[in-house]
Amino acid sequence: YRSSRGLGDVYKRQNLNSIRDSYDDSILTPPDLINECYERIEKDSKDKIWISLRKRSEAIKIAELVSISSRKNKPLWGIPFSVKDNIDVEGLATTAACPKYSYFPEKSSPVVQALENAGAICLGKTNLDQFATGLNGTRSPYGVCTSVFNDEYISGGSSSGSALSVAKKQVCFSIGTDTGGSGRIPAAMNLSL
């Protein structure tokens, strides 16, 4: 994949240092990178990675605000990430892959708030085995997450959407949970380590 501005080559590496260098050299801006992410998300829209996704326009507005803010003490300035949908993000429903459980939190969880304070940009909430009780990525009413390598194989779970959002380079990193392999298994099965 290569965008018209050639940003795809930078983002393919998905290396935070490369992205920071591209920001420093004015080759890339946070809104550019967010657009790249959404192009990848739209390209892979058949995959059941996302439960709730910020509107592109909203994410770009956040990226524009980040762009004009100081980078001092913000090691994740302009870096997009996703969050497993059992962790609260202000403005996005938390479902734990159970629609009847759905609620809108009043504020983001401390980990999400800390990442945003460090300059990171949350794009949305990812699919998981319902209530994070599974290790294969197939126990969600929002659809089955499949392997990044072959859609006839499972992705692993329960942090399946988190691992796939990174493996498919839709975001640079993701926050998941792990009690008995829920993060490690899908990360290993999809080379998201």
Specify the residue positions occupied by each region the protein language model found.
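Gly/Ser-rich catalytic/binding loops embedded in alpha/beta enzyme cores
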Residues: K12-T179
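A ligand-binding cleft/hinge motif common to bilobed small-molecule-binding domains
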Residues: G183
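Mobile "lid/hinge" segments at catalytic clefts and subdomain interfaces of large enzymes
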Residues: M189-S192
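Single conserved hydrophobic/aromatic residue that forms the stacking wall/gate
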Residues: Y1-Y11
